[in-house]
Amino acid sequence: MLKKILVGIALIVAGVVVWRFTQSSTAGSSAAPVNVSVRKDAPESDGPAVQAPNIGDVLKMASDALLAMETNLDDYTARFVKQERDSVGVLGEPTEISIRAQTRFGGDENQSPRRIYLRFQSPAAVQGREVIWGEDLYDGKMAVHEVGMILGLKTIWLDPTGMIAMQGQRYPISEIGLVKLVEKLIERGEQDRDNPSVEVSINDGHVFDEVDCQLIQVRRHEPSDSEDDFSVAEIVVDPQRQLILSYRSFGWPEKPGDQPPLLESYAYHDLKTNIGLTKADFDTKNTNYGFPRF
């Protein structure tokens, strides 16, 4: 009986901490929007006037990126770095995760189940944690190998959208990944398509992982009072591969002149695509992983 009680307590404790990608922290962040200098006075020209970019242009780029992924992206690996502000306004630490992902566009018929493997690298409190989820695996449950001498003795199975798994998270594991990021951006952008208070800039020459990318900045001049409201959003696009590599959004400063507070940041570094991931990459029995054998 004592053994069962101890195991039960361990599972509850593990569940509470398992999906907390970001550890609560009262420390601030030095993150700030990229300062981009844009000329307001274009030189005189006999040619046609160049229209400033707008949300429609951003939506077109995002739609093109989604189409490119549907055609060319079967799977990928990356060093995923995320940072989020929780529901009470506390900005968590940056969390670094090694990610392996299979998109829904793989296979001969361009249709495959979505699968994800995560291994946490930092912060130290979660280093070594592993998570596997697949829409066709384990009855939709999330397999978790927690860190620690006691908590790491047993694989924990969680509902990905349940209260324990969502503790401290903005999105469930099923919403992680390049494809979902683009789809979410399109969904948000459509809400601002006809918003006159939104200003857009698109700048070449932004370096991300030693790759020349485009930096898109979307600025709101007044709050929208929507659930996903922001003052500034930044999107980094790799134009060669038509992939969105990074997204950050900032809230509204408390007073004029203050830096806007970071709300969320997601970046995919060292991205490798179409490397041939198999079902073994999303199997708790994979000997390269640390999942317990029971």
Where would I find each of the regions flagged by the language model?
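Gly/Pro-enriched, hydrophobic low-complexity segments
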Residues: L2-L6, W19-S30, R119-A124, I132, ...
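Sequence-pattern detector for short linear motifs
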Residues: L6-V7, Q23, A42, D57
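Core hydrophobic alpha-helical transmembrane segments of single-pass membrane proteins
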Residues: V7-V16
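Ser/Thr/Pro/Gly-rich low-complexity linker/stalk segments immediately outside membranes or between
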Residues: Q23-Q51
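Hydrophobic transmembrane signal anchors and adjacent membrane-proximal interface regions, especially
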Residues: S24, V36, V50-I55, T71, ...
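Intrinsic-disorder-associated interaction segments
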Residues: P48-V58, Y171, E175
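Short secondary-structure boundary micro-motifs
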Residues: Q51-A52, A62-S63, Q83-E84, R115, ...
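N-terminal mature ectodomain segment of secretory-pathway/periplasmic proteins
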Residues: G56-L151
